[in-house]
């Protein structure tokens, strides 16, 4: 489960960059397209709006510019609405509080940088107590659809808007029978996804997770096979390394099992398999570049995994984000790694 919580100028170290700030210093060049093997690097990241209600357009422009500099081309908005709050100019009885500029400004920045955005729907924290509650699933599917209809009315024209993200994270310990997965799939995921495809037919994604103390590779395989019977075009798997759900020595086995479930046990799934790579430690600090390189090697080394996105750039790699200097060190080290591949 997620926590809610190179040209390089020799005399201008990367720590001078400003994530979300106004910074006139020269920016390092982006990795050249076609020069970096995308099976060795991150190409996307999640973004949360919790601490960004009042960001100006220039701050969003700078943040996405700095993401693009290290090769990220995809932004996944974790949620457009959370609990009682919405981050676009829409009115709902279930989200009375509004931060109406965040989503609009992020999309404008993404258009400027020619980046793709997957927009997350509505999430309420009571999901964790109601994962198999059919009445709850029905109600919150309707709420997700309401948010999607409003988002599409406002931003459906945006060239940066490439897909949807269902922010409810399924896992095999809660959905531990075929019947429970089918209930989640049919009452919730398919109800949302079928409507999304009527609205604009953009791809729909979700991010599953697992805990190796509770789930074997074989159980994850079968769970992924059952989940992928849903109307989904992208299924991500959270690697669990940051939250301590798996030891590195077991990581490849779980990813191979997940891929086998998606494409062998369920031969009908035609969608993509992405890895959601955690760039933090159990103490929530930014991880080391050595660990992240190992994660990339193991996860993208599984043939069916087509893309690696991180959770998440702003907290773990942005020098003016919550972890400041430590995040800046990781960003510098990761940027150097990407440049070394060219």
Residues covered by each model-derived region:
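Boundary/entry segment of secreted carbohydrate-active catalytic domains
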Residues: 27-80, 210
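An active-site-proximal structural segment forming one wall of the substrate-binding cleft
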Residues: 98-113, 133-163, 195, 224-228, ...
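Active-site groove signature of glycoside hydrolases
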Residues: 122-125, 147-179, 309
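Aromatic-lined substrate-binding rim segments of carbohydrate-active enzymes
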Residues: 60-126, 180-206, 250-261
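Catalytic domains of carbohydrate-active enzymes, especially glycoside hydrolases
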Residues: 58-84, 226-236, 299-309
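Aromatic-lined carbohydrate-recognition surfaces of secreted/lumenal glycan-active proteins
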Residues: 118-130, 138, 162-169, 188-220, ...
């Amino acid at each position: 489960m997620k926590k809610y919580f190179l040209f390089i100028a020799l005399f201008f170290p990367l720590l001078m960059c400003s994530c979300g700030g106004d910074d006139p210093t020269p920016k390092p060049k982006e990795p050249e397209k076609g020069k970096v093997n995308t099976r060795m690097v991150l190409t996307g990241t999640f973004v949360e709006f919790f601490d960004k209600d009042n960001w100006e357009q220039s701050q969003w422009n700078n943040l996405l510019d700095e993401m693009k500099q290290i090769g990220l081309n995809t932004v996944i908005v974790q949620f457009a609405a959370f609990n009682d709050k919405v981050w676009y100019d829409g009115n709902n009885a279930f989200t009375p509080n509004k931060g109406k500029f965040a989503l609009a400004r992020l999309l404008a920045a993404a258009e400027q940088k020619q980046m793709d955005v997957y927009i997350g729907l509505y999430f309420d924290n009571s999901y964790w107590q109601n994962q198999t509650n059919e009445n709850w699933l029905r109600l919150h599917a309707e709420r997700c659809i309401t948010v999607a209809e409003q988002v599409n009315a406002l931003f459906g024209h945006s060239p940066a808007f490439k897909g949807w993200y269902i922010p409810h994270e399924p896992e095999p310990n809660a959905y531990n029978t075929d019947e429970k997965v089918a209930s989640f799939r049919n009452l919730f995921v398919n109800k949302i996804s079928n409507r999304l495809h009527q609205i604009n037919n953009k791809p729909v994604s979700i991010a599953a997770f697992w805990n190796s103390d509770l789930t074997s590779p074989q159980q994850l395989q079968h769970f992924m096979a059952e989940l992928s019977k849903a109307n989904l075009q992208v299924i991500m798997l959270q690697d669990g390394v940051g939250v301590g759900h798996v030891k590195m020595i077991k990581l490849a086995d779980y990813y191979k099992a997940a891929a086998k479930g998606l494409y062998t046990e369920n031969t009908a799934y035609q969608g993509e398999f992405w890895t959601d790579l955690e760039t933090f430690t159990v103490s929530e600090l930014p991880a080391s570049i050595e660990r992240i390189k190992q994660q990339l090697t193991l996860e993208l080394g599984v043939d069916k995994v087509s893309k690696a996105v991180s959770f998440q750039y702003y907290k773990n790699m942005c020098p003016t984000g919550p972890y400041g200097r430590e995040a800046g060190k990781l960003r510098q080290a990761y940027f150097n790694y990407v440049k070394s591949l060219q």
